[in-house]
Design a protein with these regions (language model features):
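Single conserved hydrophobic/aromatic residue that forms the stacking wall/gate
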Residues: 1-6, 10
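Non-catalytic, usually N-terminal nucleic-acid engagement modules in DNA/RNA processing proteins
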Residues: 21-22, 26, 31-40
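N-terminal [4Fe-4S]-dependent radical SAM core
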Residues: 27, 188-232, 255, 274-286
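Conserved radical SAM core fold
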Residues: 41-43, 58-72, 99-106, 138-141
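Conserved C-terminal portion of the radical SAM core fold
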Residues: 78-144, 162-179
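Local cysteine-cluster metal-coordination motifs and their immediate loop/turn environment
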Residues: 227-246
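Short Fe-S-cluster ligation motifs
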Residues: 248, 252-291
Length: 291
């Protein structure tokens, strides 16, 4: 586990050059925030105390899709129970809900989404700082694995966003989008992004001084995406709309090589590894706390 003492993690950045390894220091003097994105926070709940030296922010996805769509995701009501426990432990300002991705099928209609969103919003009222919505992009891999999915058209996106904003106001949950149609701002959504300077300052209570040279990963994205220490082809949820996993066989092979004692997510050190230090620095303004 991670404690107040510095730890190191290693990541093979390029599958075509697997000998290239990046070393990250997991230490409070260079890591301002640990950001988690998950559909199931429960396995981490008993170990949160090990992260007490770090600021945290959690995005937890809760959608209405059943096991045919998300076969490895726990029952949604269990997930919501974990979100409430997480919020109670670290504070609602450090927890956000993702309703993502939004798509249409014969089962999951516009009306279905409206009813489901309200049920979840009712459960999470007072437990989260905001909700991020996003609409499914039909990548070729997604079309192949999930042929019945339909993208949400522009007018339906605007209708759903307006309704989600209305429901969100009712339950005290602002709606945000990230890299979606900028016109959704007219529907009442905050389109500035999900992991922005403002969001992280509110969560941590500290001013962040971001270098001007810091660039977004995608055009139109203002999120502070730092060092991603996760990997593709390691998630066992098996969601049919996923574009990050190649196939079940690759995931199973990777999981087989996971060693909890290793500083790599998958595998360990190999002969010939070329280890490069990640460029890391704190952006916290030590002189200024916001509140």
């Amino acid at each position: 586990g991670v404690s107040s003492a510095a730890s190191d993690v290693y990541k093979r950045q390029n599958p075509y050059c697997p000998e290239q390894v990046t070393r990250y220091r997991i230490s409070p003097d260079v890591v301002d925030v640990l950001c988690f994105c998950t559909k199931n926070p429960e396995p981490m709940m008993a170990r949160l105390a090990e992260l007490s030296a770090f600021q945290q922010f959690w995005f937890v996805t809760a959608t209405p899709y059943g096991p045919k769509i998300e076969p490895g995701v726990p029952n949604k009501w269990e997930v919501l129970k974990s979100v409430k426990a997480l919020s109670h432990q670290i504070g609602r300002k450090r927890v956000a809900w993702r309703y993502d991705p939004i798509f249409l099928t014969d089962t999951y209609s516009i009306e279905y989404h409206l009813k489901s969103f309200e049920k979840i919003a009712q459960e999470l009222s007072g437990q989260v700082s905001f909700c991020v919505i996003s609409f499914l992009d039909l990548y070729e891999k997604t079309k192949r694995n999930f042929p019945e999915a339909k993208e949400v058209g522009k007018s339906d996106q605007e209708f759903l966003t307006r309704e989600f904003v209305r429901i969100g106001k009712q339950y005290g949950i602002p709606i945000r989008t990230c890299c979606e149609n900028p016109d959704l701002e007219k529907c009442g959504a905050d389109v500035t992004g999900c992991m922005t300077k403002e969001v992280l300052e509110q969560a941590t209570g500290c001013r962040l001084q971001i270098p001007q040279k810091k660039k977004a990963v995608r055009d139109g994205c203002s999120c502070l995406l730092g060092s991603d220490i996760g990997m593709y082809n390691t998630c066992q949820h098996g969601c049919v709309y996923c574009y990050a996993n190649y196939d079940k066989k690759t995931v199973a092979e990777n999981i087989r090589f996971h060693d909890p004692a290793s500083p790599f997510l998958i595998g360990g050190f190999r002969e010939g590894d070329i280890i490069k230090e990640a460029k890391q620095e704190s952006y916290f303004d030590a002189q200024l706390r916001l509140f």
